[in-house]
């Protein structure tokens, strides 16, 4: 394993209300026209200056509600403070300046086709400037237990659970695989205690009440129980108390530099205020010209059965209802809850389908992991069935299944799977095999659908298969009888592991299936289906070496290298070709190939009391731009910067930060890239993502703020149109 030193250039923002005089806020009445700023009828351009002179690397934001859905476009200024916002739809816009070291300027009303110079406003003090910092800078102020406090000795000892052997395990819970899994921490909404929560003797009591708010209370209380709850409440209370007393982040974000100033960001509202999104999809991952200029589809998971659809050409958002096969399918509306300080005592989520992840196929149809019925499986999945997969490893239940939506006909096809589903990806094979992950490791299986067979026969039973994950610990290269996970390795047999994929990807070079396994330290697993799966399927397991731990989402590049974010604050790559020792046999059980790993520290500060490499970043997923749909090159891995409020692209060992400065609180769980016109240069391509926090009411704007589709484009320079 090697650790890469990754420098980065960061950017951020978010708004606060500041009272300023009209002279500070007015735009220049007679702009000085710079010949380098060449605007057309749909553009806006000009210069941004403050009391300090031209402001380089700040954002100019244009927003309108004149279109069928809210529309926002954002660009950065060049090194002389000049800007150009290209291709604005015809409408009236509010335009203002945001940037580090500044406070928001007054919003100026204007229309496209004009030169508009803007006066930026220097922040009057450090506290006013810090209000615009990304969440990671505030979350890094959280003090965590010292390394010397571990291992945990339980309630009769130091209070820390015995299961927590190290500080790194504690961090895994308060970052990607626990407290940060579903929403951001460090934003304005979470670094303060809302008065609507109630009156409490101290902040520890307030935090204990806070985490049981709403319909996610069970998940949040289960996560806090993994820590020492009294100590955790005390540390989070100390964090918010220090901030309330005026303490500020120790480090400051940098403004956009280099190519970061060439980024154009476009946003559209596309969901209801009580809905949250998990993912979006714009094209076929294998062929990113599919669905060119077409509709964008989203998955609202536990919040609603209405999946959002955005028309980015006509700026319209609509919804389609996903059905279930069994009307008695449980709904998230039934989740236990305590009143929310934002929404009161009633539930706001109501979903039977739990749509999690979408994927386009080459025919322009959208496939979903969604719930079809109750968890109890039909008989063909269970022990005693003649189904080939059930004979090898019967399954009693599955909490999510598959569905397919055909936009041309409006038809929705439901597919009941025996195996649980979470994410999905199509293979580049003759069967267009649809591989799925299960989410948590408990099911112990990976499942797939032979799409060619399903389309030919409509038989969902015969078209699906699944397998347990079996390691070739006897080293003979084939699948044999195996020992169970709780039994020691037997050199004459194989061994089953209790694992299932969270992220899932297909190696385009050899067709093997790779996935991440949640937990500490977590794993990536390679599944070779063999010639007759599931009977021939064999797995290999690889554990990230410290200081790396806690993988979550993942992807693979065209060279077969796996990329995954780690809870340790790294973007990790794993290249199996670098392994020097045996890849099967009794010693190939996880820690046998540290040389295959490279850890790239994410940008941003580290949490307090943490001396290990990495950062406070809690990245959720990684996606590889295999076909250069953005403009930074082929095979560029991009992580979701959930605390950085950005996408984080690794280019030649350095991170390029694609930050979304408005509205503050960008939190993505997925992205994809689409080529609308291969002959149109930068205008014909782009990345797509969405605000995927479960708490859109924590985003700048508060209650009523909705999830947004975000498009990223990369110009050759900040004034290109």
Segments and roles (model prediction):
Residues 277-280, 321-324, 346-351, 414-419, ...:
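Surface loop/turn motifs at the tips and blade-to-blade linkers of beta-strand repeat domains
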Residues 176-187, 236:
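The canonical Cys-X-X-Cys-His
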Residues 271-292, 345-363, 423-431, 491-510, ...:
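Structural signature of eukaryotic scaffold interfaces centered on beta-propeller domains
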Residues 189-196, 291, 298-301, 368-398, ...:
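Short, conserved, GDST-rich strand-edge loop motifs in beta-rich repeat architectures
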Residues 42-44, 50-66, 90, 139-155:
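Short, ordered, surface-exposed loop/turn motifs in non-cytosolic proteins
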Residues 64-70, 92-113:
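A short, solvent-exposed loop/turn motif at the edges and junctions
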Residues 38, 65-87:
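Short, acidic Ser/Thr/Gly-rich low-complexity loop/linker segments typical of extracellular
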